[in-house]
C-alpha cells in the first residue's frame, strides 16, 4: 500500500496507510512532548496501532529536529554572519549529548569580561559544529563506500587465513609454556591454572591521573541525537523492528538492536557457559588478555599467566568497525545481526555497541536502559536524548525487581568455602591488597551466615535453626547487626567489579571440581579433595549412580559469589530507599537474605534528568497516578513537565459489552473477598454463572481467577459437585499451567479445539480456558476473534496484604508521599492500584483489532464503586453496564453474541 503523508497541525507525518483519528492525535501529542522536552505518559489500547504511531510520530520529530539543526549550523558557520542570541542558545542546548555551556555571570562583572566570555563561547560552539560536520561527512562517505563495494565480506575472507596462522602460533606457545620453561616459577601449578590468579589490584585513587580505564573512550565518536526505544522482551523488540521496516522510515533510518551476550555472542566456547554472568565475565576476561598481550611490557617482566590466556577471535576492531557500518546501512533484527557477525567473523555484541553513536534509533531491552551499570557498560549516553519505554504498565515493578536481589544460606556458605580454598591455594602469589579484600569478603560472608543463625564451617543443608520466620530491617540496622558496618562496601563492590574475582573463582571451581586420581594421592591437594566433597553436598537435583573407580566426576558449580555481588551492591543503597528481609527457614541452606528496593525513583531519576524527553507508553496504563507520584514526582520531575495522553479504541461502541454483575443466578451476592471466596456457595455460584455464559457465547471463553491455588480449589470443587461435567457439555476445559514451558502447548490445544468446533455442528461450541491473573495468559497473549469472545474476571485480585514486603512498601509510601485531605492513605491506594492494573491487563486481552468483538464480565459487586470504575480504561469505563441481578445480565450477553455472530438473523 502506498505511503500516506499526513499533515497534522502543519507537521507532516508519513504513514503506511490512512491512520485512525486516534493515531493522528497520538502522533501530534507525541511530537509536542518531544519538541517541548516533556515527560509523556501515553495509553493506547492494544489493537489501535500504538507501535506505528510511536514510530511515525517520533521519527517525524527526529527528521524535523535534524533539519532545523543543519539549518542553524549553516547559519552559524556562514562567513561573516552571526546568529541571534536565542538561536545560539537553542543550538547550545539541543546539540547532541552536550551540556548547555551558558552559565550565569557573576553580578558586577565588567562588560568587557562578559563580552569576552560570550565571544569565546561562540567560538567554541563554531569549532564544535565544524568538528561535527566533518564527522558527519566522514560517516556518510564511509557508509556509502561500504554500500557500494561490500568491503565487509571481502575483509572477513582476507583475514581468516591470518587468524588461522595466529591460532597455530598460540598453540605452539602454549605447548612451550606447559613444558615449564621460564625463570619465574614460584611453584608448579596445574595446566591452565595460571589465569586463575588475580592480577595486582589498583584502587581508583591509585589509578587516578594515570588513565588506565577499561573503557575505550578514544574509539568512540560523538553521539548524535537519537531515540532509545525499549520494551520488556526480545520478541516484542523484534516485532517493533519489523514495524519499523514496514513504516515509511524503514529504508532511511539507522537502527541498532542491542541485546545481551546471551543473545548476540557468536563464540561457541563462551555461549556454552550458559549463564549471562559467566558469559559477561569470560568475555571481558578474554579482552583483558588480548590487551595484556598487545602491551609492550618492556618496563615490567611479563607474568606467566599473561602469556597463556586466549583472546576471542571475533573481538577484532577492524572487523567490528566494518560490521558497525553494515549495521547502520539498513535495518536488521537480532537474527540477521548474529548471522552477519558469524559471516564477518566479527562480534555482533560489540559491533552493535560501536554503532550506537551514529544510530538514529536504538532498540534495547528494559534492563539495559534501566540499570545504570549495564547502561554504562553498553556505551549508552542519555544526555539530550529521547527515551521511549513501551509496554510500561509494570514499569515500577520492573525497576524494583531489577534492583532487588536475594541470596540463600547455601550460596553464602559455598562462596565462603570456595574463596577460602582459593586464598589458601594462591596465597603466595597474591599481592597484599588482593589478600586484604579477599579477607574482607570472607568476613562479610561469615557474618551474613551468622545473621541467619548458622556457621560457615558447617554444611548449611544439615544446620537446623531453632528460630524461624521473617525479619525486616533497615539497611543500617542490618549492617550493624551483622557487625560489618565498619567495612567500606563501596570499595569492596568496586574491587569485585575490577578484579573479576567471581570469574576467577568460577574458573577455580571448574579446574578443581573434577576428581582426579592425583588429587587424592597428593598431600598438597587433600584440602581441595575435601572442598570437592563439600561442593558435592551442595549440588541440587537427583543423585546419579556413582562412577567407577578412577573415573572423573564432572562438577560445574558456578561460583555463587557472582550472585552475592549483586546483594553487596544493593547494600550501598541509601538507608531510606531499601530494606533487608532476613528469612529464616528450617535450615541455614533454605534461609535467605533479600534486599527490597522501596524507592524505584532513585534509579529512574538519572534517566529523566539526563534525557531531553521521556515517553512511557502502554496499552493499559490506568491508573496513571502511580507513575506520577511514585516514579516521576519522587524523581524530581515537576508536575508541569508531565503530559498524560489516553485515547479510545478503534472498535465501534457496539462491538464491546462490559458488564458488572453484582449477584448470581441464585441471588447470591458476588463478593470474592479473601474470607468469602472459598465458601462452597460462592464457588458453586461462579460455576453456575459460567455454565450459563458458555451456553450462549460462541468460541472461546477466558476466565481469570485470583491465584493458582484458588484455581485448583475451584476446579476440584466443580469436579466433585458435577459442575465440571455440565461445563464440558458446551466447552472443552483447559487450565493455565504453572510451568511457563507448558503454556504454548496448552494455548495450541485451546486454539485447535475452538477452530475445529467452528467447523462442526456438534454440541461442543468452543473451549473454556481457566487462567490466573498475573500469569502468562494475562500478559502478552492475544485472545483475538474466536479465541476470546468473552472474558470473565472472578473477583478482585488484591495482593496479599500480609506480605512483609508489601507492608513495608505501604509504610514507606505513607511516610514519603503527601496525603490529600479526605483521600485514603497512599499505601491503601497502592493496594487498589496493583489490583486494578492486573485487572486491566487481563481484560485487555480480548479486543485486538477494529473488527473484533467481545463481552467482558466482571463478577463482584465492588466493581460498581465509583473509585474502582474510575480506574478502568476509558474505552471500557464509558461503555460499562452495572447489573444488580443475573437475569438482565445474561439476557444482555445472549443478545450481544446473537447479533454479532448472526447479524443476518437480527
UniProtKB/Swiss-Prot annotation:
Residues 78-111, 284-310 are annotated as: Disordered. The modification Phosphoserine is found at residue 260. It comes from the Eukaryota. It is found in: Nucleus; Nucleus, Nucleolus; Cytoplasm, Cytoskeleton, Spindle pole; Midbody. InterPro entries: ATP-dep_Helicase_C (IPR006555), DinG/Rad3-like (IPR045028), Helic_SF1/SF2_ATP-bd_DinG/Rad3 (IPR014013), Helicase-like_DEXD_c2 (IPR006554), P-loop_NTPase (IPR027417), RAD3-like_helicase_DEAD (IPR010614), Rad3/Chl1-like (IPR013020). Its EC number is 5.6.2.3. The keyword Lipid metabolism does not apply. A motif (DEAH box) lies at residues 390-393. The keyword Transcription applies. Its cofactor is [4Fe-4S] cluster. Pfam families: DEAD_2, Helicase_C_2. One of its GO terms (cellular component) is nucleolus. Residues 284-301 have a biased composition (Basic and acidic residues). Keywords: 4Fe-4S, Activator, ATP-binding, Cytoplasm, Cytoskeleton, Developmental protein, DNA damage, DNA repair, DNA replication, DNA-binding, Helicase, Hydrolase, Iron, Iron-sulfur, Isomerase, Metal-binding, Nucleotide-binding, Nucleus, Phosphoprotein, RNA-binding, Transcription, Transcription regulation. PANTHER family: ATP-DEPENDENT DNA HELICASE DDX11-RELATED (PTHR11472:SF41), DNA REPAIR DEAD HELICASE RAD3/XP-D SUBFAMILY MEMBER (PTHR11472). Belongs to the DEAD box helicase family. DEAH subfamily. DDX11/CHL1 sub-subfamily. DNA-dependent ATPase and ATP-dependent DNA helicase that participates in various functions in genomic stability, including DNA replication, DNA repair and heterochromatin organization as well as in ribosomal RNA synthesis. Its double-stranded DNA helicase activity requires either a minimal 5'-single-stranded tail length of approximately 15 nt (flap substrates) or 10 nt length single-stranded gapped DNA substrates of a partial duplex DNA structure for helicase loading and translocation along DNA in a 5' to 3' direction. This is ATP-dependent DNA helicase DDX11. It comes from Mus musculus (Mouse). The gene is Ddx11.
